[in-house]
Amino acid sequence: MAHKKAGGSSRNGRDSAGKRLGIKAYGGERVIPGNIIARQRGTTWHPGLNVGMGTDHTLFAKVEGHVEFRAKANGRTFVSVLPIAVAAAE
């Protein structure tokens, strides 16, 4: 009888789920303490005033206010939270 030799298994078939990285609160948006502003791998965005950075480089608000993105001359983008009183005065 004719038999077919066993075929090798495919080496494909792996795909990981997306990690939902990126900006979660855009410039001008109101945030409260603890709100996540951005999830990232490495420091695409750097923490500025009233913004903290977690161990996984997540940026979060330390005070209530409005988010502001500002690019510096060295090419780095800093994310700050302007407190409500300061944001209203500007």
Curated annotation (Swiss-Prot):
Protein name, entry field: Large ribosomal subunit protein bL27
Gene Ontology cellular component terms for the protein in this record: cytosolic large ribosomal subunit
InterPro entries in UniProt: Ribosomal_bL27 (IPR001684), Ribosomal_bL27_CS (IPR018261)
Database matches in SUPFAM superfamilies: Ribosomal L27 protein-like
Top-rank taxon: Bacteria
Pfam families: Ribosomal_L27 (PF01016)
GO molecular function, one term: structural constituent of ribosome
Family per record: Belongs to the bacterial ribosomal protein bL27 family.
UniProt region (Disordered), positions on chain: 1-20
Keywords of this entry: Ribonucleoprotein, Ribosomal protein
GO terms, biological process: translation
